[in-house]
Amino acid sequence: MFPMVTEFMNYGQQTVRAARYIGQGFMITLSHANRLPVTIQYPYEKLITSERFRGRIHFEFDKCIACEVCVRVCPIDLPVVDWKLETDIRKKRLLNYSIDFGICIFCGNCVEYCPTNCLSMTEEYELSTYDRHELNYNQIALGRVPMSIIDDYTIRTILNLPEIKT
């Protein structure tokens, strides 16, 4: 055939293919227009954390037997456990327990392997400070129960549900 006609046919096919690609991209854009916004207004809106969320560690001083299992299973040997051996009753008495959350990787091994369940993970994740030394929590700071975001009336909570694809 004539070279000019074949070039014109190729040009027409390329134009149709380009229009199809543009149409596909436009359809994807339109399908995203119906979705809810992903952005939340953080200080005033907060997501409800999942059930297995690993936040700040909560420590119950009365349950601890100073066995130091938490120190042995920690990948970075983080918890500092100070204890004294009571010779009359032949048991360890816990003096001090502290965790530096500036170093903690929140792996949860200490919580999982604690034989007396004196450690637990909370839903608290706002640990930022201006001074890194404030992240070193002793047993008193670790023993404070965080306020649930559901109970705070100034904050609108948003349930974080996974999308169900249909």
Swiss-Prot record:
Q: Which reaction does it catalyse?
A: a plastoquinone + NADH + (n+1) H(+)(in) = a plastoquinol + NAD(+) + n H(+)(out); a plastoquinone + NADPH + (n+1) H(+)(in) = a plastoquinol + NADP(+) + n H(+)(out)
Ranges for domain 4Fe-4S ferredoxin-type: 55-84, 95-124
The main location class comes to: plastid
Q: List the cofactors.
A: [4Fe-4S] cluster
Subcellular compartments: Plastid, Chloroplast thylakoid membrane
Record-level GO cellular component terms: chloroplast thylakoid membrane
GO BP annotation list: photosynthesis, light reaction
Q: Quote the record's binding site residues for [4Fe-4S] cluster 1.
A: 64, 67, 70, 114
Keyword Metal-binding listed? The answer is yes
Q: How does it sit in the membrane?
A: Peripheral membrane protein
HAMAP family recorded: NDH1_NuoI (MF_01351)
Q: What does this protein do?
A: NDH shuttles electrons from NAD(P)H:plastoquinone, via FMN and iron-sulfur (Fe-S) centers, to quinones in the photosynthetic chain and possibly in a chloroplast respiratory chain. The immediate electron acceptor for the enzyme in this species is believed to be plastoquinone. Couples the redox reaction to proton translocation, and thus conserves the redox energy in a proton gradient.
Q: What is this protein called?
A: NAD(P)H-quinone oxidoreductase subunit I, chloroplastic
| Originating organism | Ambrosia trifida
